[in-house]
Structures are given as C-alpha cells and as structure tokens.
C-alpha cells in the first residue's frame, strides 16, 4: 500500500494502527452485543464484515477504499476476538477448554506468521499481492456459510452487563 499510493512512513503506519484503534473503541460494545445476540451470531457477523472488507479492494483499489477496508478489518477482528473464545466455551467441555484455547492461539500465530509469506508467494507467482484479497474473501465466505449451517447451543446469560460494569473490569 505504501509503494502503490506513494505514502510516507507515518501515513502508511495508520493502516495497522486502525485495526488496533477499532479494537480499543469496540471491544466493550462488542461484548455487550454478544450478550444480546449470542456468541455464534457475533462470530458470524465478524466473518461477514471481514468478507466485505476483503471484497472492497477487489472492486476499487484506491487509497480511500483501502482505508475503509482496513477499518472494516479492524471491526471484524474485534468482533471475532471478543466472541470466539466464549463460543468455543459453549462447544468444548471444561476439561478440554484450556487446550482448545491454546491450540486456537497457536493456529492464529501460525496464520499471522504465514500471512506475509503467502503474500510474497502471490507476488512472485502472479506479480501482484492483491490476489490475496479474493483468496481470503473466499475463505471468509466459506467460513460464514459453514458457521451459519451449524447449530450451537449457547449458555444463556442471567443478566446483561452494563457499559460501566464492563469498563470497571479494566
């Protein structure tokens, strides 16, 4: 993005910063949303938002669209990071939960490690790293379809937490 749009270092660094900014702004509201609509629907919403974010650069590779795309990626990441572990707790029994969470973190670390390598391979193979967007869009779409087809019985919350109660945990 930096080279494509001739951005300075400080402007180019806004892209990854936006992902973290959205996590800061939306993590507590996401937990409140999750309490209202459930973990599965929140994870599904995160995958749909991520898929939309990955589709935008395919339609229009412009600086403005990349800003929107990275913002949506940050929002999607926030939703999934807040809601995925509670969803897993509804699926995996208590004695296997810790190892399942650890395995999930390991897989996330591997994916983060492989991302730049895959981008480099796409660049070498096809001459353009932008082919990552449709590939990851397809992965997100398949994930959304798969999750929407599965029924998960979620534990009901006795009461919803207020914004201030969530904030007091920090």
Each PLM stretch: what is its role?
Residues 25-64:
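Conserved MFS/SLC helix-loop-helix module at the cytosolic interface between two early adjacent transmembrane helices
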Residues 69-106:
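Cytoplasmic helix-loop-helix junction between adjacent transmembrane helices
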Residues 1-10:
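Short amphipathic helix-loop junctions that connect adjacent transmembrane helices
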Residues 53-57, 73, 147:
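MFS-fold secondary transporters
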Residues 154-170:
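Juxtamembrane intracellular "pre-TM" segments in multi-pass secondary transporters
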Residues 100-152:
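Helix-loop-helix hairpin linking two adjacent transmembrane segments in secondary transporters
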Residues 20-28, 113:
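Residue-level signature of mid-helix packing/kink "hotspots" within the transmembrane helices
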Residues 13-20:
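Short hydrophobic/aromatic, small-residue-rich stretches within specific transmembrane helices
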């Amino acid at each position: 993005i930096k080279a494509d749009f001739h951005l300075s270092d400080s402007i180019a660094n806004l892209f990854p910063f936006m992902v973290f900014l959205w996590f800061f702004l939306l993590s507590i509201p996401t937990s409140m949303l999750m309490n209202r609509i459930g973990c599965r629907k929140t994870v599904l919403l995160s995958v749909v938002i991520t898929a939309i974010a990955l589709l935008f650069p395919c339609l229009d590779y412009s600086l403005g669209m990349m800003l929107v795309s990275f913002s949506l990626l940050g929002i999607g990441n926030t939703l999934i990071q807040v809601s995925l572990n509670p969803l897993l707790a509804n699926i995996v029994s208590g004695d296997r939960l810790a190892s399942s969470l650890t395995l999930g973190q390991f897989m996330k670390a591997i994916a983060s490690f492989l991302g730049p390598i895959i981008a480099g391979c796409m660049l070498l193979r096809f001459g353009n790293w932008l082919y990552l967007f449709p590939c990851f869009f397809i992965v997100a779409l398949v994930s959304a379809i798969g999750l929407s087809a599965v029924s998960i019985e979620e534990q009901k919350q006795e009461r919803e937490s207020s914004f201030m109660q969530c904030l007091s945990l920090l």
